[in-house]
Regions:
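Peripheral, non-transmembrane regulatory/ligand-interaction domains of membrane transport proteins
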Residues: 2-215, 221-224, 228-235
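Hydrophobic alpha-helical transmembrane segments and their immediately adjacent juxtamembrane loops
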Residues: 53-54, 230-284
Length: 284
């Protein structure tokens, strides 16, 4: 059934293998392959689970947007779930949030499971990563984790740039639209910070994990991943603090402007009331 799905050209299941000419897509799963599942159907999950002796619930877990980051060691495979950053366009605006991403390590293959074709993975599929080999499974995991950490940093810089642009607009016109955009960016930073801290726990456990072979040549790469992730956490915190301070400052400005407007209206009301009082008094 699995081979049939592949022959039918499933877009949800793709198999990649490193050859002398680089990364290429193959039709049959061979030892040392990378099997990528992107938003797979129930049938594809079931056939994959049966073919490779993986619990179907573990394959489904990364497809649940509420799934928490963790490492789970089973008898014949290890499941790693962490959060990755993503962008979604709604009504002409970009929204930043995170979704789960699963890596399954077996003695022959690497599986990845995700709801979308994330830039975290597409660079590997396109052969744009140096020293990437599907059969070097431990290094491949570290490379994906490193790519994920750098994507967080990249998106954080975009969020910071967007917040600067919105702030400039607020200086000119304090409209609700700009304030809502600032709130959305602040919410994105909260998502990122929470996800990065969850990923940090996974990385710490990965350092102590023995189910995935560790090689001396790859140790530095894992250390780099941890450093990049910590840097992303610090950057998210700094940007969040700055954004919160900016929001508070503009809230104070708006409140002051409102007070001034209310005082002005009170004066106008009194001025308009005086003639009425005088007229009433003379009428009496």
């Amino acid at each position: 059934r699995y081979d049939k799905l592949l022959k039918e050209g499933s877009l949800m299941i793709r198999i990649f293998k490193t050859t002398d000419s680089g990364i290429r897509k193959v039709a049959v799963a061979e030892e040392g392959c990378w099997i990528a599942l992107t938003n797979p159907t129930a049938e594809e999950l079931s056939t994959t689970a049966d073919q490779f002796n993986i619990d179907v619930d573990d394959l489904k877990s990364p497809l649940d947007e509420e799934e928490r980051s963790r490492i789970q060691v089973e008898e014949n495979y290890t499941l790693i779930i962490l959060d990755i950053p993503t962008i979604e366009e709604r009504k002409g605006r970009e929204y930043f949030y995170t979704i789960p991403f699963g890596i399954i390590f077996t003695d022959k293959y690497i599986f990845t499971v995700c709801l979308v074709d994330s830039p975290v993975l597409t660079v590997f599929m396109d052969g744009r990563v140096k020293d990437f080999y599907t059969y070097k499974r431990t290094r491949f995991i570290y490379q994906m984790l490193y790519r994920n950490a750098t994507m967080f940093l990249q998106y954080l810089k975009i969020i910071d740039k967007k917040s600067d642009e919105v702030e400039k607009k607020l200086h000119i016109s304090q409209r609700n639209q700009e304030l809502i955009e600032m709130l959305d960016l602040e919410k994105s930073l909260v998502y990122f910070t929470t996800s990065l801290r969850g990923n940090e726990v996974v990385l710490e456990k990965l350092m102590r994990n023995t189910s995935i072979p560790r090689y001396e040549d790859d140790e530095e790469l894992l250390e780099d991943v941890i450093i990049e992730n910590k840097q992303a956490i610090e950057m998210a915190k700094i940007y969040s603090d700055i954004l919160s301070g900016t929001m508070d400052a503009f809230a104070s400005v708006i409140s002051n402007n409102l007070n001034i407007a209310m005082k002005f209206l009170s004066v106008i009301t009194i001025v308009l009331t005086v003639p009425t009082i005088v007229t009433s008094a003379l009428g009496m």
